[in-house]
Amino acid sequence: MAIKRIAAMLLTSVLLLSCIGCAQDGRKEPGAEKTDLGLTAEVKPATDFTAKANAAVYDELDFDDKQEYEFATRGLIDAPETLELKDEDGTILWSQEAYAFLDDYEKAPDSVNPSLWENTKNNHAYGLFEVTDGIYQVRGYDMANLTVVKGDTGWIVFDTLMSVECSQAAMQLIEKNLGKFPVKAVIISHSHADHFGGIAGVMAKEDKADETLSIEEQLASGKIPVITPVGFTEHSVKENVYAGKGMGRRSNYQYGILLTPGVTGKLAQGIGMGQSTGTVSFMTPSYEITQSGEKLTIDGVELEFQLTPGTEAPAEMNTWLPQYKALWMAENCTGTLHNLYTLRGAEVRDGAAWASYITEAISLYGKDAEVTFQSHNWPHWGNDVVNDYMVNTAAVYKYINDQTLTYINQGYTSDEISNMIELPEALNKIWYTRQYYGTVAHNAKAVYQKFMGWYDSNPVNLNPLMPSDSAKKWMEYLGDVDKVLQMAKADFDKGEYQWVAEVTNTIVFADPTNTDARLLCADALEQLGYQAESGPWRNEYLTAAQELRHGNANFTASTKSTGDMVKALSAPMLFDYMAIVMDKQALADRDFTMNVILPDVGEQHMLRVKNGVLLVYADTLSDDADVSITCPKNALFAILTNNQETVAKAVKVEGSAELLTLMMENMNQFPITGANPFNIIEP
């Protein structure tokens, strides 16, 4: 029970959330009636300025070049006429049907950047596709792809989608068209949930090979090896737990969970149509690849692995299949500019290292590769095309890294660089390096952050006021807020949407009840969203606009978890999480030690709570601890969730049981449902 409780508590750390809009703080939600400035809370069409900005994209790019669409649709074997996956209660978990409106337009509507429209159409091409004879992909059944390689007697599966229900549907489509064969191995390319969450839809947990055996013994055992890059388990759970609630809330902005698909709503994300909301599973690997160049033969298929740590994920690897002259690029080349920084929040990625691993792949395999395929979007065929694809992708990441450093050394700040930097024209016009997911602007900020951190060296910015305090002082100095709003409305009518958003959001932070400021800010953000080429940027703008118009939202976890990822947390990770959720103020005057003995995993640790801080001493016990506990590792979940009934049954306590109770009672789990989540677009 404790594991189920903490699985629910941590669910938003890994998954997206669904929501129901509501007004907050008793504020009356604006309706269709007009304010003094003539504003309403309704969704608006594109303005003339936005329509012209989007129309100009047709002059910037070669829309007669249909190679990416041809690659996205090439090799189609089968696709259902409509695709909408539901759970047993009828809840929609994944839908391509929601994007059927794409067929109603000959060209992009005024409210959509035409380049993003092209990417959305390409990502709407779903079904079972042949990559080459013996390699097949199910695309469009989740944000990522499920790939199978035919061995002598069965399938080798590369990545398993986000949700069990989606991977089950994908495997059913494969079996319907290609026959039913056993799964001989599962290879997970990297440590993000949209690539491993559906594994229980591909194989049963009891069929996993014994990780204590050698890989040769695993393959001979008749069980299924689960093969990952080294560090997979640690990074799969760690990145999503420590800052999970913050990431979970921000993910709703990045992925547009509040938004309805449509020409004024959500479109593609650049690497797919969004994430599914089914059941997320997890299995620890039975075998880890620990060095580049390692070779395995599985069911007659030769595989050579290239580790690429610190690229798109902390633990990631490419795979070369020489018999097929096919190169699996994981998520290192995806047919779009990816993120050096993801908007939901995460550690920044190294653009130079990313480029270096791509060029290493070219050096190793580029001479022979006839097709590249990956975990998102579609393959690229032909040796010249493959090499150009990889070279150009590497060049974009390297350029952003190097040009940002050039500007840094010329004294420019992060905000200045993000406004200045542009790709060379030749790279900028390539469809598969366009900014559908990441952008040059925010990736440049990532490079700045990696090398310089948050501070721009201007002491005015060293210790600024709280945003709401600063906003109130601005309004105090400006005096007539109504006049400021009239000026902002005039600038809106001139198409100056970024400035209008900035000034009106300042008013919102000074006075969140100012309806004119909220609605004008929303209108400005909406137009910025319509102009955005990046799917996540569009989502960010439109989600903020919706929250300004209709208030914050109550959230409930829209996905289910098997709890396996939570069980994979090591004891040190659990102690780290305890330190995060512990009520530090309540324990600020306490100082005590606790020995923790975990016989089932052969570990012992000493914890010290000192002035509200939880310090962990690994592989150490105190001779005079205030309290000592002995329990299975999983019983730590009961302590974390203050499940005193389970603790009484599973935990042996010596010394001051009151201190254990005190610690448990001061574990502040972050709320998942009920009260509104933290604000983003307002104080």
Task: Map each language-model feature to its residues.
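Feature captures hydrophobic
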Residues: G26-T35, A490, E496-E502, T506-F509, ...
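Conserved beta-strand hairpin/beta-sheet module of binuclear metal-dependent hydrolase folds
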Residues: K121-P182, M317-L321, K325-E331
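Divalent-metal (often Zn2+) His-rich catalytic cores of metallo-beta-lactamase-fold enzymes
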Residues: G38-T50, T336, A355-E416, M420-N458, ...
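Active-site metal-binding motif and surrounding structural segment of the metallo-beta-lactamase
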Residues: T153-G154, E165-P225, V508
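C-terminal motif of bacterial Sec signal peptides marking the signal peptidase cleavage site
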Residues: S18-G21
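Alpha-helical segment of the N-proximal tetratricopeptide repeat
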Residues: K472-V503
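Metallo-beta-lactamase
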Residues: E130, G154-W155, M162-E165, S221, I227, G231-T308, ...
